[in-house]
């Protein structure tokens, strides 16, 4: 069951939205408002959430409020990875939530929180437990990022290698399961907090790991799952067949479905982070996906 629609992913991060083109996020704001209206036209009861921000910046939320975006939404979301990428300590999580609560009355979801096992699995094990202690009861949705390590043969793209929130080598070690599917120490730690903690797991186009992921999600008792449908993937041959397969596999979970990423051919710049040439096309994608999977 789709329980919420999320509009974009990390819109204040250059790895996901090219704000060198859209310097004040005016294009993004107009696109997000159109997307929210399109989703509501297909399912007026479906909550709409602003894509999780990284870094956690109250100024960005205020910008979205001033541009009328938040008036169209039911929640905002944040992402935090303080043991890997952020410029603050893990113990500052409550302060970071308070910073956002100071500029909006909307509920604040934590749509990605994670710790890598790059340095040591014990660090990730600690990170799961400490994150749960700090966050449970402070947010209506908490999605741990992620279940699966990224295969090292896949790219983890970044626009600024050392910038806060960027994806670099640690990104390959964020899972509770290793690339070969074997569990890490943190898996047992996570199981103590499921189903209060959900999972964020992205699936690549025709991802061979889908069935393995569903098996482990069920074994862990996960109820709340965040994933995405990429507008860029939607332009591929057989896209709907893949989307249908993915969504059928996830029917047993309460899914927050993220709509994001521009087909390179439809961007101002030929890249999935680019603002679209025609923002209405993204809204149309959101409407089609809502109609197909969440109406």
What are the residue ranges of the model-derived segments?
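Substrate-binding cleft and catalytic face of glycoside hydrolase catalytic domains
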Residues: 1-56, 214-295
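Noncatalytic carbohydrate-binding groove/subsite architecture in carbohydrate-active enzymes
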Residues: 2-3, 22-132, 137-138, 155, ...
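Hydrophobic faces of well-ordered beta-strands that scaffold small-molecule active sites
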Residues: 3-7, 48-51, 74-78, 108-111, ...
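Cell-envelope and extracellular/periplasmic
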Residues: 10, 20, 80-81, 113-114, ...
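Residue-level marker for beta-strand->alpha-helix junctions and adjacent short loops that shape enzyme
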Residues: 12, 55, 83, 115-116, ...
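Aromatic-rich peripheral "rim/lid" segments of glycoside hydrolase catalytic domains that contact
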Residues: 23, 120-126, 137-139, 143-216, ...
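Residues that form or flank phosphate/diphosphate-binding pockets in enzymes
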Residues: 59, 208, 238
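A generic structural signal for ordered secondary structure
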Residues: 110, 131, 141, 218, ...
């Amino acid at each position: 069951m789709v329980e919420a629609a999320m509009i974009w992913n990390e819109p204040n991060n250059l790895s996901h939205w090219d704000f060198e083109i859209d310097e004040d996020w005016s294009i993004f704001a107009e696109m997000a408002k159109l997307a929210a209206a399109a989703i509501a036209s297909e399912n007026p009861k479906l909550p709409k959430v602003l894509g999780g921000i990284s870094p956690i910046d109250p100024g960005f939320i205020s910008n979205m409020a001033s541009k009328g975006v938040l008036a169209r939404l039911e929640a905002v979301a944040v992402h935090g990875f303080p043991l890997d990428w952020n410029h603050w300590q893990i113990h500052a999580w409550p302060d970071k939530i308070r910073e956002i609560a100071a500029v909006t009355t909307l509920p604040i979801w934590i749509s990605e929180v994670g710790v890598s096992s790059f340095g040591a699995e014990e660090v990730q094990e600690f990170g799961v437990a400490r994150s749960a202690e700090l966050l449970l009861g402070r947010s209506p949705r908490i999605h741990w990022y992620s279940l699966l390590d990224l295969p090292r043969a896949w790219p983890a793209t970044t626009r600024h290698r050392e910038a806060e929130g960027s994806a670099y080598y640690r990104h390959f070690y964020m899972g509770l399961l290793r690339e070969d599917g074997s569990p890490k120490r943190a898996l047992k730690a996570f199981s103590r907090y499921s189903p209060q903690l959900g999972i964020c797991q992205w699936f690549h186009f025709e991802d061979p790991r889908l069935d393995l992921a569903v098996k482990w999600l069920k074994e862990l008792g996960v109820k709340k799952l965040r994933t995405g449908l990429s507008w860029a993937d939607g332009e591929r041959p057989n896209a709907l067949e893949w989307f249908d397969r993915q969504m059928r596999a996830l029917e047993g979970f309460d899914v927050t479905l993220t709509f994001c990423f521009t087909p390179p051919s439809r961007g101002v710049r030929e890249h999935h982070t680019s603002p679209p040439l025609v923002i209405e096309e993204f809204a149309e994608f959101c409407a089609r996906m809502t109609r197909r999977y969440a109406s």
